[in-house]
């Protein structure tokens, strides 16, 4: 070797020879008897000498020797330790030095197909050989370390001063580099285990998938039927198999059954290798079961049978050779190596016999040539267990490989599970509301509150603490302005094909200047022609199942609980012409205003009545005597006609009432004494006047008490509105009560008006609502104080309304018109007309117009005999001087009406009728009022959705129709004019001109409200309210409170009052919550199922600032050795919940924008109210490009809070839907169910003319969420929202967004197709690698998104039922009265501890 000359640090030839000699001896001799220590010390020593000698030379001259040294060291240590792990059972380790040069390695397998010889007329089979081609997958392992410059100088003795300090520093540098090198090379050992574990996981499908696939017989392409059947079994297995070790911790037999199923569903390897693992008795190990340390400990504690505690493992690996271009022709049948001495001899070239003082496994005693080449094994500690009929190596790498490495253990993962809970649902069928024992969960009070509609849901959080969600928690969702966002919905509906439908009920016409009876007669003649078919809005008799059926044409317009959508003539301003113009149809929308207008199938009568019972609890109830008297009066078909005549001429005026006080007293007393019924209960003004002026002995005490009881009940109903309203400042000049209940809204008027009070207060109401009024076809009205005999005009056609004389004060010319009564009077009158009268009449009343031009002359035709002043007035009709004596009963005189009613009135009382001529009524006038939504519902979209309500000025309400009274039947004084469905009894229409039998039948099905008095979809009182009145079976007290509950408004601001005061708003919610859990998995792999190739290690180093960096890279590759799935995994145990499983409610004010309210103070109030008491505090609005970042609470107790989102749904929803896994939309979605057409995915999700594929008897469970552009769809569908629904913050996002649904369903479809394809017979030209199918990860990490279903947890609307259910009572009821229990049907069933 030549001498190298350098300016410094000259190396002599002798030193160079010594250095070369060091590299010729790869392993040093240290008398330890341990070959590993020998290799380690020798390698370190050579590295130190290497650095010391070549510091002044170029490092690249010696890189080859250094790389060989590190590579030899790394390979030796790597496989000596790796082969002792249980993972080595599943692989065949092969040395492949040329791996770095392989680009496309291919391996071909030959598999012989078994045969069965059969008898009979079968074709004779011949041997079949299948050839399968597999390609190797290249990988690599890399690690790095650095040597600082200071350490290099110490190692190379560049600066040596010969002191002890210098020697100490040099030893410290040597030790530090040795530690670094050992750590780096140890990382290769751990990396090999981690890499192979990852390889096995990549080809291991979930047990829940593989087990059903193996049992599914059909091969090849799966049609829709086969896919659906397979999916059904797959979903069942996912729920049953997940967390089986946690769920059945006390049932080892069941765990053993799952494990046996797990090890039996894989296919054995095609490789028959001499290199294998056995127990100490020589039985081969069939596979390896890898798990976590916790699960391993549990399995060894009585679940699995331990077969052996040691195993004989091979301490060798094969070699690879190449023939041709990158073709792997020999797999593992290479040279076998015997023990550690062979490793040292063949790998390190240690040939000196003196150095081989290494203990080795003794050779086998059989020296036969057939066994001489068998590999020698080493005995290592192992846990060999019996699973089924297989011997399995039980391994846990969590601590041996991954501890303190900052690398996650692959068998510890996370899973997201979405939970679904119904809140506020009422079981509409009375047969579903039962209790087995009267004493179950009994309460102290007489009225069991469990009969009332549920308003909350109880469940357990992660710590087993009872947690509750109430309807109030939904304020952050339902009280958001997104409830009013229907602009895009209307645009979408108008783009659909629309057929011209029946416009009756959706069209408001202008009135004319003709008299009201003429207009009504004209309407009735043309009414039938206006309806080519029955309108859909009258079909309130449908059951919930019929309503949500695909055949219901009304279903596609049921998109939002707060709106009615309907087909109407386009481009027509309302009110329009008398007949709807021939225009292209369009879709319009109106606010439902009150919750009573929600269709009866979606908010059934049984719910309304049950809510009424709750509202009336502890409040005033009418006595049985009152109920009987008033009920009999409303049903009295012989009710005196004279009472209607007197009521009309009094026309609500207090002065007129006082003038007729004597006559009215005799009438009321006479009617009571002869029938025990009460007169004038159809008129609120008369009720008030009677209780005021006739309560001091004028009437019998029992009789007057009935009037007082009625009025007291009206006041109790009024107080109920106050009780369910949070008192505070109003908005835009409207009080809180006016924003909460329609009966306290000044813009809403009573059906009968006797004076202009309501119109005056209405004009003084919120100007922003643009209140308008049309009288006799003209805009506005003119009020007169009064008219008398000299100034009356029965043929008046203008818009003049007679206000009436006040009881006190002047009414001269120029005196302004002022109200006779305060606002409270008007509220009470509306309560009486819209609640009390309908409750007693049950649809048998009708509003009537009065022919005053005939009535006043009839009143003049009264005969009062003259009595001398010195004689007493007669007291009985038998006296000839009495006005009702037979001689005085002249035909067509007023005396006859009193006589026919069996009433006894005296002459003085009759003479008081003359006092009415000073304040007369002229006509009954039709009034049409309209207004925009109140401040709580006013947006840019809804501001033009005006409400039109009709009323009669100087009309009256007629009770039971008197068909045999000629005066009534012929319409002599009165004619029917229905103003809304509550007062549209078809019997009363008989007096109208042209009323045929066909029209009478039609009137029983469709309320004949003339268009100039409003239309169903534009009115405040709509068909659902009228249907409730006529079909309710509850008592009168309950019905009054039930009707009151239906008049609460349904707007964001009104819902804040109702939900905070415990009022059920008439809708329910689907609660959706997503939680994350840490899981522990089991992995089973067959013996020798994977070939693992190890290439030559490569060392790269480069100088860096402050030292030298070394990077070690070793190529690896692997190939599967099976013709089927040779590995399987299972999510076996629940490690811990990562979220709190709590009740944190979503607040849309902090997560998304919404349509702006027209009044900013409303938005701020909603934001403040919904945030009060919540966990998120409101913040000031941020710039447009900044999100709303609410201030969170100062502390947190149970981990990450999981957010609960609320999906509005009908209160009559079928509870059975929520007892199993279901879709929060209420309709199954998924490409898996569809056919081959691309449009099928759209049809599956949104085409509600087709049945739900999961429930073929209906189109959907929740039309407000499953239909396209419905309320729930607009709220949670990420397609429409840029800042709204989010896959990160919204658990509903993946169920409502079509792109997410399509992606998940495509994944599921591919999962099943590929899993089935590889489970079937393989063809000869395929390159199946038997990887876990795409979607397996989603199946184990997010099964709810994959299957598009959420799981119901254990929850109940009543805490007592929940405690009984988890206590394990046999046969515990799922229903108790109106309360319900939902049993846990999620994978977590039985996994989390519950309180005892």
Swiss-Prot record:
Record protein name field: Major capsid protein
Subcellular location field: Virion; Host nucleus
Family: Belongs to the herpesviridae major capsid protein family.
A GO CC annotation given for this chain: host cell nucleus
Primary localization class, coarse: virion
Keyword list, A-Z: Capsid protein, Host nucleus, T=16 icosahedral capsid protein, Virion
Record-linked Pfam families: Herpes_MCP (PF03122)
């Amino acid at each position: 070797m030549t001498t190298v000359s350098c300016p410094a640090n000259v190396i002599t030839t002798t030193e160079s020879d010594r250095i070369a000699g060091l590299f010729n001896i790869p392993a040093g001799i240290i008398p330890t008897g341990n070959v590993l220590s020998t290799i380690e010390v020798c390698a370190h020593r050579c590295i130190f000498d290497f650095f010391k000698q070549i510091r002044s030379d170029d490092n690249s001259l010696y890189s080859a020797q250094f790389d060989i040294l590190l590579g030899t060291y790394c390979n030796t240590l790597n496989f000596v330790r790796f082969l002792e792990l249980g993972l080595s059972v599943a692989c065949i380790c092969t040395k492949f030095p040329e791996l770095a040069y392989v680009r496309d390695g291919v391996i071909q397998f030959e598999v012989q197909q078994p045969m069965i010889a059969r008898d009979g007329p079968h074709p004779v089979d011949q041997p079949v050989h299948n050839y399968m081609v597999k390609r190797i997958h290249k990988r690599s392992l890399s690690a790095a370390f650095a040597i600082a410059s200071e350490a290099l100088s110490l190692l190379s003795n560049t600066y040596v001063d010969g002191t002890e300090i210098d020697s100490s520093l040099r030893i410290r540098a040597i030790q530090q580099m040795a530690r670094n090198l050992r750590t780096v090379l140890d990382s290769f050992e751990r990396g090999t285990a981690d890499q192979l574990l990852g390889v096995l996981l990549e080809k291991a499908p979930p047990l829940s998938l593989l087990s059903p696939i193996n049992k599914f017989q059909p091969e090849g392409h799966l049609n829709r039927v086969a896919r659906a059947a397979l999916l059904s079994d797959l979903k069942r297995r996912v729920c049953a198999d997940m967390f089986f070790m946690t769920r059945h911790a006390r049932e080892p037999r069941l765990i053993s059954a799952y494990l046996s199923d797990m090890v039996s569903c894989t296919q054995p390897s095609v490789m028959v290798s001499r290199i294998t693992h056995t127990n100490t008795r020589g039985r081969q190990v069939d596979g390896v079961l890898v798990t976590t340390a916790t699960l391993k400990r549990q399995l060894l504690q009585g679940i699995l049978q331990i077969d052996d505690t040691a195993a004989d493992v091979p301490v060798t690996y094969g070699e690879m050779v190449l023939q041709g271009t990158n073709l792997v022709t020999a797999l593992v049948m290479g040279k076998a190596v015997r023990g550690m001495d062979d490793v040292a001899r063949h790998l390190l070239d240690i040939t000196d016999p003196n150095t081989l003082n290494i203990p080795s496994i003794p050779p086998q005693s059989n020296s036969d040539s057939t066994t001489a080449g068998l590999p020698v094994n080493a005995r290592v500690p192992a846990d060999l267990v019996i699973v089924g009929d297989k011997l399995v190596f039980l391994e846990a790498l969590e601590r041996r490989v991954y501890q303190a490495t900052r690398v996650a253990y692959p068998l510890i993962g996370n899973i997201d599970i979405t939970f679904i809970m119904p809140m506020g649902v009422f079981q509409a069928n009375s047969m579903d509301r039962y209790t087995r024992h009267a004493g179950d969960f009994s309460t102290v009070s007489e009225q069991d509150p469990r009969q009332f509609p549920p308003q909350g849901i109880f469940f357990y959080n992660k710590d087993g603490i009872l947690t509750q969600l109430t309807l109030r928690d939904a304020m952050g969702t339902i009280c958001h302005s997104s409830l009013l966002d229907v602009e895009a919905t209307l645009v979408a509906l108008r783009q659909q094909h629309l057929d011209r439908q029946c416009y009756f009920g959706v069209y408001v016409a202008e009135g004319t200047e003709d008299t009201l009876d003429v207009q009504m007669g004209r309407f009735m003649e043309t009414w039938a022609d206006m309806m080519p078919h029955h309108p859909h809005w009258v079909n309130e008799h449908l059951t919930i199942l019929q309503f949500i059926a695909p055949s219901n044409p009304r279903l596609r317009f049921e998109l939002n609980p707060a709106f009615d959508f309907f087909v109407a003539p386009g481009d027509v301003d309302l009110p329009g012409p008398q007949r709807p113009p021939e225009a292209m149809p369009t879709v319009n929308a109106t606010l439902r205003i009150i919750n009573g207008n929600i269709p009866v199938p979606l908010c059934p009568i049984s719910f309304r009545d049950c809510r009424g019972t709750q509202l009336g609890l502890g409040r005033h109830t009418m006595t049985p005597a009152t109920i009987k008297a008033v009920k009999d009066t409303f049903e009295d078909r012989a009710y005196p006609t004279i009472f209607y005549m007197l009521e009309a001429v009094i026309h609500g005026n207090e002065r007129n009432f006082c003038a007729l006080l004597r006559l009215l007293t005799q009438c009321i007393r006479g009617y009571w004494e002869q029938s025990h019924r009460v007169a004038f209960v159809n008129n609120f003004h008369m009720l008030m006047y009677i209780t005021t002026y006739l309560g001091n002995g004028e009437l019998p005490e029992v009789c007057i008490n009935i009037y007082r009881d009625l009025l007291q009940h009206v006041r109790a109903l009024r107080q109920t509105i106050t009780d369910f309203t949070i008192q505070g400042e109003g908005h835009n000049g409207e009080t809180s009560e006016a924003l909460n209940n329609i009966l306290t809204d000044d813009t809403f008027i009573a059906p009968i008006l006797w004076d202009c009070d309501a119109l005056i207060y209405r004009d003084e109401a919120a100007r922003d609502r643009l209140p308008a009024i049309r009288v006799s076809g003209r805009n506005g009205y003119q009020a007169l104080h009064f008219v008398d005999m000299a100034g009356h005009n029965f043929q008046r056609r203008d818009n003049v309304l007679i206000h009436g004389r006040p009881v006190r004060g002047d009414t001269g010319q120029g005196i302004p018109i002022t109200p006779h009564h305060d606002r409270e009077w008007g509220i009470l009158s509306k309560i009486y007309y819209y609640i009390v009268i309908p409750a007693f009449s049950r649809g048998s009343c009708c509003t009537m117009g009065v022919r005053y031009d005939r009535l006043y002359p009839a009143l003049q035709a009264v005969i009062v005999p003259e009595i001398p002043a010195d004689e007493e007035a007669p007291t009985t009709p038998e006296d000839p001087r009495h006005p009702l004596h037979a001689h005085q009963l002249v035909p067509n005189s007023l005396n006859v009406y009193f006589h026919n009613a069996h009433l006894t009135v005296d002459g003085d009382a009759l003479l008081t009728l003359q006092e009415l001529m000073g304040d007369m009524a002229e006509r009954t006038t039709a009034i049409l009022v309209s207004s925009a939504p109140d401040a709580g519902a006013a947006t840019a979209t809804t501001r033009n959705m005006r409400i039109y309500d009709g009323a009669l000025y100087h009309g009256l309400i007629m009770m039971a129709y008197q068909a045999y009274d000629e005066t009534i039947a012929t319409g002599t004084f009165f004619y029917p004019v229905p103003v809304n469905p509550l007062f549209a009894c078809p019997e009363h229409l008989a007096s109208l001109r042209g009323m045929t039998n066909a029209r009478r039948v039609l009137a029983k099905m469709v309320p004949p409200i003339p268009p100039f008095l409003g239309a169903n979809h534009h009115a405040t009182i709509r068909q659902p309210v009228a249907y409730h009145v006529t079909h309710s079976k509850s008592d009168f007290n309950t019905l009054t409170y039930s009707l009151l509950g239906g008049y609460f408004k349904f707007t964001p601001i009104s819902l804040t009052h109702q939900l905070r005061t415990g009022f059920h708003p008439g809708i329910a919610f689907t609660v959706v919550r997503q939680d994350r859990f840490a899981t522990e998995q089991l992995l089973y792999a067959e013996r020798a199922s994977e070939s693992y190739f190890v290439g030559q290690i490569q060392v790269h180093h480069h100088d860096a600032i402050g030292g030298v960096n070394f990077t070690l890279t070793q190529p690896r590759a692997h190939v599967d050795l099976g013709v089927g799935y040779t590995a399987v995994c299972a999510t076996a145990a629940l490690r811990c919940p990562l979220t709190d499983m709590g009740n944190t409610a979503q607040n849309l004010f902090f997560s998304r924008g919404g349509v702006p309210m027209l009044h900013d103070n409303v938005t701020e109030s909603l934001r403040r109210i919904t945030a009060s008491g919540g966990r998120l505090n409101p913040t000031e609005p941020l710039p447009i490009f900044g999100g709303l970042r609410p201030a969170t609470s100062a502390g947190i107790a149970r981990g990450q809070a999981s957010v609960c989102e609320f999906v509005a749904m009908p209160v009559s929803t079928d509870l059975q839907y929520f007892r199993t896994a279901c879709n929060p939309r209420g309709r199954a979605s998924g490409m898996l169910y569809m056919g081959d057409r691309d449009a099928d995915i759209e049809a599956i999700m949104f085409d509600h003319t087709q049945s739900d594929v999961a429930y073929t008897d209906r189109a959907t469970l929740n039309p407000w969420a499953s239909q396209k552009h419905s309320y729930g769809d607009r709220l949670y569908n990420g397609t429409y929202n840029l800042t709204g629904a989010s896959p990160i913050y919204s658990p509903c996002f993946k169920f409502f967004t079509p792109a997410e649904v399509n992606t998940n369903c495509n994944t599921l479809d591919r999962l099943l197709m590929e899993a089935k394809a590889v489970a079937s017979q393989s063809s000869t030209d395929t390159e199946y690698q038997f990887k876990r199918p795409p979607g397996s990860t989603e199946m184990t990490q997010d099964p709810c998104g994959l299957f598009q279903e959420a799981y119901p947890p254990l929850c109940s609307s009543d805490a007592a039922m929940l405690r009984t259910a988890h206590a394990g009572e046999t046969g515990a009821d799922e229903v108790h009265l109106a309360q319900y229990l939902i049993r846990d049907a999620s994978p977590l069933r039985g996994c989390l501890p519950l309180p005892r």
